[in-house]
């Protein structure tokens, strides 16, 4: 049974309730006139010590974020503000939430993907007084309930990861009446925001974190590249050297995945729809061909696009027996899992995190992490130091929104001064000096 926390006056009470009852508790009248409010919903509050150990570990290495906490504590921009976060809920994101809380804000958080929720980390946040609504493997209906729970208190700023909170705020404008802006983390989310802006539907200012150089050059490329292969190797216990890897998409994420696969000794094939990226990948030393031609050749297929059903059943039917399918784009719809399930004669769990599908021709196809984000659903996510950069950008942009006059609706880039501040802070904590103009040395 999940653990539910309630506030009543100054006290917090934890109760274990049947799961089906938890979603009737967002607003309860107690004795007719006293409102009882749900503070958190996690799988098991007793997991908190395990989660706290993980948070304490990443805190040691998120040195840029720690420096910015000290910097932003001076002007009290975060004090008495309400901040909502919808982001993959694991130790590094939890530490961001706690930094925001330490700066004086009240924090609500849920996971942007139910398969990426780490229940022990959610429990640790609840113990710290963060309003967390997240359970690993929750249904889509439950996920939508969690989204409502983090915005019903009308936040001043939002951190989004994929655009789902932004969509909800537009369906319920009253939730956004205090909103000064949104910080969007991902390629997928920024694309959704730009479409809304082009259609004239975007009501709020939004900063596209993903378009900052301090984000895509490091998080998207090096972070995803390393974490994707760490997860694939952990899940499969297979050797990568000598395998043929098909990377679907050659944006910054695809570049990182292909680069790390090459470094591990794999032969890499890239598939693309963008002619410039296709030529770039060829110049980088990779074979380039359509997915259908690559399908019979690949041992491991990794989708990196953020687009729906890029790896379809007609591709999967051409694959060799023993092929592995993994997704490291944002959502869990890049691989046509529904089509695979309908077509396969038989499906079973082959190993934790791996499903085996027996195709009509007898071939075995292996799906990793249910088609969700393999690096998070099947691993620990990006390296700590990489997310230190990305979350420093988030914190810097939240501070910018809270300390500035409200911007007009639209999609804004990360201000250059914030982007540069973050990367210079990283150079400082790593003890790296660089040349300035003339004889100046910057350290």
Protein language model annotation of sequence segments:
Residues 37-78, 112-116, 122-243, 435:
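Glycine/serine-rich phosphate-binding loop and adjoining beta1-alpha1 elements at the start
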Residues 106-117, 269-271:
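Short internal beta-strands
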């Amino acid at each position: 049974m999940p653990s539910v926390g309630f506030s009543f006056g100054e006290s917090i009470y934890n109760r274990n309730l049947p799961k089906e009852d938890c979603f009737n508790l967002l607003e309860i009248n107690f004795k007719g006139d006293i409102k009882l409010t749900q503070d958190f919903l996690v799988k098991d509050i007793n997991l908190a010590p395990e989660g706290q150990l993980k948070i304490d570990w990443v805190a040691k290495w998120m040195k840029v974020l720690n420096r910015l906490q000290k910097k932003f504590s001076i002007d009290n921009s975060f004090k008495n503000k309400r901040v909502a976060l919808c982001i993959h809920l694991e130790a590094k994101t939890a530490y961001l939430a706690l930094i925001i809380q330490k700066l004086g804000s009240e924090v609500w958080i849920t996971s942007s993907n139910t398969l990426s929720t780490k229940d022990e980390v959610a429990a640790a946040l609840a113990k710290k007084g963060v309003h967390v609504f997240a359970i690993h493997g929750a249904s889509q209906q439950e996920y939508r309930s969690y989204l409502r729970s983090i915005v019903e208190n009308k936040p001043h700023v939002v951190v989004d990861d994929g655009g789902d909170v932004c969509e909800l705020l537009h369906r319920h404008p009253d939730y956004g009446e205090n909103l000064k802006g949104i910080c969007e983390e991902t390629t997928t989310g920024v694309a959704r925001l730009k479409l809304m802006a082009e259609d004239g539907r975007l009501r709020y200012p939004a900063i596209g974190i993903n378009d900052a150089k301090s984000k895509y050059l490091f998080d998207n490329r090096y972070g995803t590249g390393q974490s994707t292969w760490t997860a694939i190797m952990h899940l499969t216990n297979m050797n990568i050297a000598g395998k043929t890897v098909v990377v679907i998409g050659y944006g910054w994420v695809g570049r990182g995945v292909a680069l790390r696969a090459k470094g591990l000794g794999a032969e890499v094939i890239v598939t693309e729809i963008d002619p410039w990226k296709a030529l770039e990948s060829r110049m980088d030393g990779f074979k380039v061909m359509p997915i259908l031609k690559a399908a019979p050749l690949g041992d491991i297929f990794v989708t990196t696009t953020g687009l729906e059903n890029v790896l379809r059943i007609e591709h999967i039917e051409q694959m060799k027996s023993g092929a592995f399918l993994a997704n490291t784009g944002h959502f869990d719809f890049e691989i046509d899992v529904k089509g695979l399930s309908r077509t396969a004669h038989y499906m079973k769990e082959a190993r934790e995190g791996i499903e085996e599908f027996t195709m009509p021709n007898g071939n075995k196809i292996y799906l990793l992490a249910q088609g969700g984000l393999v690096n998070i659903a099947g691993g620990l996510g990006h390296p700590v130091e990489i997310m230190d950069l990305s979350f420093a950008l988030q914190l810097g942009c939240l501070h910018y929104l809270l300390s500035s006059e409200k911007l007009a609706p639209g999609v804004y880039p990360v201000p250059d001064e914030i982007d540069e501040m973050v990367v210079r802070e990283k150079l400082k904590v790593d003890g790296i000096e660089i040349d300035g103009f003339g004889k100046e040395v910057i350290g």
